[in-house]
Amino acid sequence: VKECLEPAASARNVTIELSGDSFTVRAAYKHIYELVENIVSNAIKYNKDGGRVEITLHDVGETGCIYVRDNGIGIPKESLNRVFERFYRVDKGRSTKEGSTGLGLSIVKHIVNCYGGTVTLDSELGKGTLVCVRLPIAKNISE
């Protein structure tokens, strides 16, 4: 995902950093790809010039955690409980300009729920956003 989104990040002068543990989750590759792509794409779109997106992976026992943190524009507190709703856009003017449909985070939530995981989002207006996805780790490759 990082390599695919580098051109979009570069066009906005946003740096993507990847770190952490390697793990395998019980999920289809295409779903995990779509999940991470949606989150990172938002982190790039709603960032500032010279911004940063950090993708951190952690193997925490039976759970794989994917953290995506940005130092972008953030989300107002009153919108936090609605961002996973289909077609919800925090700033309709900016979202339209950015080509947003308001489906990205609802797709993320759906994928995570299908695989028995959780997704949380914390944000501060003007400071950035942290998205945390937790999914069950596959104990062996046949899972």
Where are the language model's segments positioned?
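Glycine-rich G1-box
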Residues: 7, 73-74
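Conserved micro-motifs of the catalytic ATP-binding
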Residues: 20, 24-31
